[in-house]
């Protein structure tokens, strides 16, 4: 869509062949994918990722630079600018203190292209971020990758995330694909006396204090912690599918959590940030096609939830294009599940309501964050004295190269036998600041309220009541 718009607009400017109808049609498609507050879906599915920033927000601003006198372009300048400013308000909360972007979605081999929308805001003058915060975000993203081996010994960008990792190649990737990262260098086209270069860098939101935010379009519940600079999202709205569709989970879209400090396990069946069920052969269910139930804040605590029919997938030989969606196949239904993420800072109380479990006789698995064992991250899943008994636990290991390390570990807790209908709960924590004091201090009190280590509390019964599931 945007490739065609930009190329045809260039041809129009140099006397080449182009079609106004093509450009109009492309702009109409672009507008049809708008989902509010600066966010676009990458197609008709619940597909939200970095393309919102480096494509849907950048190209409209480039079009303004290419054809400022075109009546069509002038007519949409204010609208496109407002959308960009709205998006940047959210995007700046998704950058870690080390400059890491949120590790979620396809085409992550484009690396520091994630900085592009921040530069676009300065080019267009449509941003509420100060020049100092803009440069902190953009230069931080660039430095994050350059410090972690993005260039090989020949000085070339390779397919990978930190260093080269060919396993990240997707069906549309080529040897030159990593050079889409060039968008992240857009700021070099701004003059040396532009405020973005002369201003003193200012702290990112996560460097100034703990952050809480809900981003409605993708259904992301954001918690950033100043103690370790990590931004986490709990995901109840994005799966690169639509409600009711039963396909395999896409590792980069359908997990319950993503962060700036972890890279998802790339296996479709995984305990990575999962609420899943294991059959007699150990196969795990998927959640794609879930229904978003809502989000609210109460006394400094965030709550988001979704429900779904857990399902096993026998993947078709040709499970579909490798553009982010989970693989298609034959689905076998399992239990009905409601999952609520009750979060404050690094700590999540994960509530799980299970129904119709008897038809599957499967074991429950509540999985935590995928942490590289050499990265200094603490990832834990801990039991709490509430709800059904969780009498089994372990850590899933992948002793093989990974986009950000060599040894991946994912803790989990669950049931040793077949799960029964009922309510279950566990504390799920990802921390980069050493001992898990926050997790150890989080517990249920005698009054039935769950208390976080800093004293914030929430009544779990009210969580279910406010979500009001049928």
Model regions and ranges:
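Low-complexity, glycine/alanine/valine/leucine- and proline-rich hydrophobic stretches
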Residues: 206, 210-296
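Glycine-centered flexibility motif
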Residues: 15, 38-39, 99, 143, ...
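Carbohydrate-active enzyme catalytic cores, enriched for enzymes
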Residues: 96-243
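Residue-level marker of positions within ordered structural domains that often coincide
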Residues: 13, 35, 64, 123, ...
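Extended repeat-based interaction scaffolds and adjacent low-complexity, acidic/S/T/P-biased segments
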Residues: 267-470
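Aromatic-lined, polymer-binding surfaces characteristic
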Residues: 1-88, 92-119
């Amino acid at each position: 869509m945007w490739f065609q718009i930009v190329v045809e607009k260039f041809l129009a400017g140099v006397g080449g062949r182009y079609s106004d109808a093509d450009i109009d049609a492309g702009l109409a498609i672009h507008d049809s994918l708008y989902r509010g507050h600066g966010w676009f879906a990458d197609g008709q599915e619940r597909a939200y990722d970095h393309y919102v920033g480096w494509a849907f927000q950048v190209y409209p601003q480039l079009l303004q630079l290419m054809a400022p006198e075109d009546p069509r372009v002038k007519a949409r300048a204010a609208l496109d600018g407002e959308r960009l400013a709205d998006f940047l308000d959210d995007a700046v909360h998704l950058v870690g203190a080390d400059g890491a972007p949120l590790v979620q979605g396809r085409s992550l081999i484009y690396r520091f292209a994630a900085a592009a929308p921040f530069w676009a805001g300065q080019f267009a003058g449509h941003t509420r971020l100060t020049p100092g915060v803009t440069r902190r975000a953009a230069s931080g993203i660039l430095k994050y990758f350059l410090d972690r081996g993005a260039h090989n010994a020949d000085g070339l960008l390779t397919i990978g995330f930190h260093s080269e990792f060919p396993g990240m190649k997707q069906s549309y990737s080529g040897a030159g694909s990593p050079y889409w990262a060039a968008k992240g260098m857009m700021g070099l086209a701004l003059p040396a006396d532009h405020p973005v270069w002369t201003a003193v860098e200012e702290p990112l939101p996560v460097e100034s204090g703990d952050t809480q935010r809900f981003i409605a379009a993708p259904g992301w519940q954001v918690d950033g912690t100043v103690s370790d600079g990590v931004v986490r999202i709990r995901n109840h709205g994005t799966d690169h599918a639509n409600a009711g569709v039963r396909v395999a989970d896409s590792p980069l879209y359908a997990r319950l959590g993503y962060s700036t400090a972890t890279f998802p396990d790339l296996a479709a069946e995984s305990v990575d940030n999962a609420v899943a069920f294991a059959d007699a052969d150990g196969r795990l269910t998927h959640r794609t096609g879930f229904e978003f139930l809502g989000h609210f804040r109460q006394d400094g605590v965030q709550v988001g939830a979704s429900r779904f029919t857990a399902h096993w997938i026998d993947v078709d030989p040709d499970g579909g294009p490798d553009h982010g969606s989970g693989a298609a196949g034959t689905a076998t239904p399992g239990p009905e599940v409601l999952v609520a993420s009750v979060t404050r800072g690094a700590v999540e109380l994960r509530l799980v309501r299970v129904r119709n479990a008897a038809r599957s006789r499967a074991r429950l698995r509540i999985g935590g964050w995928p942490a590289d064992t050499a990265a200094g991250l603490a990832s834990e899943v801990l039991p709490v004295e509430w709800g059904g008994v969780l009498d089994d636990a372990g850590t899933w290991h992948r002793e093989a190269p990974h986009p950000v390390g060599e040894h991946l570990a994912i803790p989990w807790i669950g049931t040793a036998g077949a799960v029964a209908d009922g309510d279950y709960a566990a504390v799920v924590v990802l921390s980069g600041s050493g001992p898990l004091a926050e997790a150890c201090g989080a517990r249920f009190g005698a009054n039935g309220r769950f208390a976080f280590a800093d004293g914030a509390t929430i009544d779990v019964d009210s969580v279910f009541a406010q979500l009001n599931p049928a």
